[in-house]
């Protein structure tokens, strides 16, 4: 991608107030697209885009989420920056993402996992991800001024979609934050990184999460986002209504929040199986006392 085209695309994203993370991602994706053909995107057309999507799918074996990012970047370039009059749903189709369910940690597993995070700063960040349902990018960019102990809320500024919101400040989380403050005495950012004036990186927290997961011995996968998922499901199972959870998590659509209804087990477990309603028990061919212990 030429310097002029990169500059034009960046300016188009800036005037639309896209986040810096989105801008960086889109420029990277379009640059990879151009390098694949060793040509400027200005001379590439519909068939080239189709071939690139097939390359990402069949040769690179990328998942639908990764391809979706590439497609969004290419769509922006050709629709906005280059102004191509195409039917983009037809020309640059976005892959359908499989409706998979995240694996949810139980409350006991959350306690155990957080206890395995040895660094106080990283443990505090991951605790906030669970206690307030924050994205990792939101947690690492918190400033001390975001903690409002008078109103017992945390102000999340410019979250995903450039939207501000408030989340609850748990009394227990407040005590964790106070203890962290006295232990670390951070300057500027609440969670400063190695570069003066800059917050800790997402990568550093993700590495700490991986190390804690290895120490914990948990079979379930754990990422910072796993704690956000657990926040939503545990609230839902405790009786919090879906609209409140949507506001706390900063979801634009209630449909995004509604997927947690498929994960919450409180209603599932409270539903009686028809097997238990049969008039007589079904025969069990093996004496359960004589077989080896089962894995469940």
Predicted regions and their residues:
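Conserved catalytic core of the tyrosine transesterase superfamily
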Residues: 1-296
């Amino acid at each position: 991608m030429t310097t002029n085209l990169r500059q034009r695309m960046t300016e188009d994203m800036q005037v639309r107030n896209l986040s810096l993370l989105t801008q960086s991602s889109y420029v990277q994706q379009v640059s990879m697209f151009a390098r694949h053909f060793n040509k400027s995107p200005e001379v590439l057309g519909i068939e080239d885009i189709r071939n690139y999507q097939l390359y990402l799918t069949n040769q690179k074996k990328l998942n639908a989420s990764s391809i979706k990012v590439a497609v969004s970047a290419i769509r922006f370039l050709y629709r906005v920056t280059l102004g191509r009059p195409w039917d983009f749903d037809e020309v640059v189709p976005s892959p359908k993402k499989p409706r998979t369910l995240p694996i949810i940690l139980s409350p006991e597993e959350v306690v155990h996992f957080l206890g395995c995070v040895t660094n106080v700063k990283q443990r505090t960040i991951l605790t906030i991800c669970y206690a307030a349902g924050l994205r990792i990018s939101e947690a690492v960019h918190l400033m001390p001024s975001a903690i409002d102990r008078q109103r017992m809320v945390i102000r999340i500024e410019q979250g995903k979609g450039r939207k501000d919101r408030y989340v609850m400040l748990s009394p227990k989380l407040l005590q964790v934050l106070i203890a962290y403050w006295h232990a670390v005495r951070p300057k500027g950012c609440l969670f400063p990184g190695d570069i003066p004036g800059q917050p800790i990186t997402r990568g550093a927290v993700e590495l700490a999460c991986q190390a804690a997961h290895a120490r914990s011995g948990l079979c379930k996968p754990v990422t910072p986002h796993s704690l956000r998922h657990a926040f939503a499901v545990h609230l839902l199972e405790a009786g919090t209504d879906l609209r409140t959870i949507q506001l706390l998590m900063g979801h634009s659509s209630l449909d995004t929040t509604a997927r947690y209804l498929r994960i919450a087990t409180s209603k599932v477990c409270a539903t009686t199986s028809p097997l238990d309603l049969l008039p007589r028990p079904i025969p069990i061919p093996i004496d359960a006392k004589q077989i080896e212990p089962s894995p469940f």
